[in-house]
Amino acid sequence: MADGQMPFSCHYPSRLRRDPFRDSPLPSRLLDDDFGMDPFPDDLTSSWRNWALPRFSTGWPGTLRSGMVPRGPTAAARFGVPAEGRSPPPFPGEPWKVCVNVHSFKPEELMVKTKDGYVEVSGKHEEKQQEGGIVSKNFTKKIQLPAEVDPVTVFASLSPEGLLIIEAPQVPPYSPFGESNFNNELPQDSQEVTCT
C-alpha cells in the first residue's frame, strides 16, 4: 500500500448503532415546557430515561414481531411469527385472552361459541327505526385458538365499557407415561434423619 492511501472499509460512522437511552450530548428542550398542563404521572418529564430504560431494555420473553416481516407460511416458520388469522400464543402460565369491542350491542344480542378450534363471536341487532331509515347491524368474528388452550375451558365476560373479554387457561404440558424427564428416586444425600 502506498503512502497516503487508506485501506477500503465498509465502516460508516452514520450507521453505527445508537443507544436511545444514553444521555444525549445536546440537551433536549422538547419536554421542558409544560404549556399549563399537569405533569405526567411520576414526573415523567424530568426522569424519562430512568422510567424508560428498565421497561424497554429488558429481554423480551417471546419473539419480536416487526411490521416488515412478510406474512405467510414460510415467514411463520422462519421468523416464529403466527400466520395471518391466528392469535399469538400465550406466554407459559398465563391465560389466553382476547378482547373484542362490542359496545354497540346488548348482552342478549351477542353469542360466543367454540367450533373446530375457533372461538366464534357474533352479534345481531334487530331492525330499528333510527334517523332517516331502518338500521340492522350484524357481525361475526372467528379467532383461532392456540394449541395450548382447551376449547371446553373458554369463557367470556362483558365489561361495562363494552369490551367482550374471552379467556381460557392453558393446558398444562404433559408427557406420556414412561417418557418422564424427572427422576423418581430420592437423592442419596437426603436431609432426612432416621430416628431411633
From Swiss-Prot:
The keyword Transmembrane does not apply. GO terms for cellular component: cytoplasm; nucleus; protein folding chaperone complex. It is found in: Cytoplasm; Nucleus. Residues 74-185 form the sHSP domain. InterPro entries: A-crystallin/Hsp20_dom (IPR002068), Alpha-crystallin/sHSP_animal (IPR001436), HSP20-like_chaperone (IPR008978), HSPB8 (IPR043254), HspB8_ACD (IPR042790). One of its GO terms (molecular function) is protein homodimerization activity. CDD domains: ACD_HspB8_like (cd06480). Phosphorylated. The modification Asymmetric dimethylarginine is found at residues 71, 78. Pfam families: HSP20. The modification Phosphothreonine is found at residue 63. Keywords: Chaperone, Cytoplasm, Methylation, Nucleus, Phosphoprotein, Stress response. Residues 178-196 have a biased composition (Polar residues). The modification Phosphoserine is found at residues 24, 57, 87. Its main location: cytoplasm. GO terms for biological process: cellular response to unfolded protein. Residues 1-35, 176-196 are annotated as: Disordered. Involved in the chaperone-assisted selective autophagy (CASA), a crucial process for protein quality control, particularly in mechanical strained cells and tissues such as muscle. Displays temperature-dependent chaperone activity. Belongs to the small heat shock protein (HSP20) family. Monomer. Forms a ternary complex with BAG3 and HSPA1A. Component of the chaperone-assisted selective autophagy (CASA) complex consisting of BAG3, HSPA8/HSC70, HSPB8 and STUB1/CHIP. Interacts with HSPB1. Interacts with DNAJB6. Interacts with BAG3. This is Heat shock protein beta-8. The gene is HSPB8.
